[in-house]
Each structure stands twice: as C-alpha cells, then as structure tokens.
Design a protein with these regions (language model features):
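Structural signature of tandem-repeat unit edges
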Residues: 1-15, 24-37, 47-60, 69-83, ...
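Consensus positions within tandem repeat domains that build extended binding/scaffold surfaces
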Residues: 17-22, 39-44, 62-65, 88, ...
Length: 177
C-alpha cells in the first residue's frame, strides 16, 4: 500500500476496520468527517499523514489506531467527547491538538504535555491543572512546590484527586481551597 495518497470516503461509510490502511506510507489525506469508529492499527505506520481532522460526531478510536504515524503534527477534534487515549498519538513528537475547551481532547493534551489550542479562537490554552469534566484532578503542571488546589478549574468544581495525580512530582505540600 505504498502508492495510495488520498482517501475520500462517502458519507455512508462510518467505520474503518482494524488494520484497513496499515503501512500506507504515502497516504497524505483522508476525510474522517463522518467516521464514528476507527479500528486498532487502522492507520498504523502511515508516515505520510501530517494532519487529522475528526468530525462533529463522537468517534470511537481503538488502540494504536494511529501508532507509527510519526509525521502527524496537528489533530483537530470537533467533538468534545472524542477520546484520544490509547490511539498512539501520545507517542508523537511535535504534535498539537485543536479542540473545545474542557473537552476530552484537552484532558488528553494536558495529561500528555501536548500543546492544546482552542478550536474557536486558535489561542493556545495553558493550564496548570489537569482536570477532567467530572472534577477529578489528574495532575499539576505548574512550578510551585507548595500548592493549593482551587475549588474549581475552568468552571468545573473539584471533588476528587485522581490516581497518581502527584506521583513523581516535586510538590512538597498540598492544600485544598
């Protein structure tokens, strides 16, 4: 599959099966607007891909779907519920994610130290706190060693500290507002 450069799928196609386009190293463009399911290793080692845009509908992306796609530098996630966990994207260098504020994509970016940009404004969002939509604190990315966890972050009330939230950090004290 080294000659394939572009995939244009009709709206009737909503799923891409496991390994479907694996090692299509010349693939540069694919329309994923109507896709709701992407199988594991579906685009494994598609080194020609530089950008991905996931559509308005939630997309179920299986394990390592984009693993080895070493040249992807921009992922746009139009649906706030689409998760990028386990997709293979966290291993990429020079990746930026564009999505909605307080989305699952932003949480993924924050957890993995990937630059995140607001889809509406294009502005880079830098958070000290890694917090999900249910108020769970998953980490702190600031420089302080004595930290005070705020009552809310980005309008979300904090109610729990997540697993390994401060593991291997340089924090010396934690207090809650």
């Amino acid at each position: 599959c080294t000659a394939l450069t572009k995939i244009n799928l009709p709206a009737s196609v909503t799923a891409i099966a496991s390994g479907a386009f694996g090692s299509c190293t010349s693939l540069e463009s694919i329309n994923l607007d109507n896709i709701s399911s992407i199988g594991k290793f579906a685009f494994y080692n598609c080194t020609g891909l530089t950008e991905l845009t996931l559509g308005e509908n939630p997309v179920d992306i299986s394990r390592k779907a984009f693993s080895g796609c070493s040249n992807i530098t921009k992922v746009t996630v139009k649906n706030s519920e689409t998760s990028l966990d386990s997709t293979g994207l966290a291993e990429l260098e020079n990746l930026s994610i564009y999505g909605h504020i307080n989305s699952v994509a932003q949480l993924f970016a924050d957890k993995n130290d990937i630059p995140f940009y607001d889809l509406k404004t294009g502005e880079r969002i830098i958070n000290e706190w890694v917090v999900d939509n249910e108020g769970v604190v998953w980490g702190y990315k600031g420089n302080e060693t004595d930290i005070v966890i705020p009552r809310e972050v980005n309008g979300i009330a904090i109610n729990k500290i997540g697993e390994n939230a401060f593991a291997n950090s340089k924090i010396t004290s934690v207090e809650m507002e």
